[in-house]
Amino acid sequence: MSGVAIARGSAADVDAVMRIMDAAFDPAFGEAWNRAQVLGILALGDVWLDLATPAGAESPEGFALARRTLDEAELLLLAVRPEARRQGIGEALVEAVAAEAGVRGGLRLLLEMRDGNPALSLYARTGFGQIGRRRDYYRGRDRSLHDALTLARPLARDPIDT
């Protein structure tokens, strides 16, 4: 994770976000958001964008978009350009989001992802565990159905789990 600078982003960074997202998300699954969706969520309260730039890079190679609602935070999107993967960028982004979520009062960090997404290993390494499954939740561009996995990571002592 050393050598990755994390900076808070804003709507002014949407071009960088879209560049990363277009490269990172497989169009077969239709998981990427469009520009209007990114700008729309950034306009809401308690939403933040983190940008990750590895040492020596001129521009961000990854981003994370998250929000807090009451005592939970949700990692909405995390993407790293394919050529920049396996350099600790994803892990640095997860840790930055978790830290900010805790500062904002989150007790746990949630995310939802397609079953079979290779990022599952990243989330397992960074303390997430599966807490739910939605059968046939996602529909790929080829009309195939994929389960959604709900993952959670505790950020502080969660009174629900006591």
Region locations from a protein language model:
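Terminal substrate-recognition subdomain of acyl/acetyltransferases
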Residues: S2, R143-T162
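Generic structural signal for residues in well-ordered beta-strands
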Residues: V4-I6
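Acetyl-CoA-dependent GNAT
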Residues: R8-R85, E91-A96, E100, R104, ...
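Short glycine/proline-centered loop/turn elements that form peptide/ligand docking sites
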Residues: S59, G90, V94, G116-A119, ...
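Short glycine-rich hinge loops at helix-strand junctions in the catalytic core
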Residues: G88, G127
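Conserved GNAT acetyl-CoA-binding A-motif
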Residues: A101-R114, L122
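Conserved catalytic-core motifs of GNAT/GCN5-like acyltransferases
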Residues: L110-E112, G129-T150
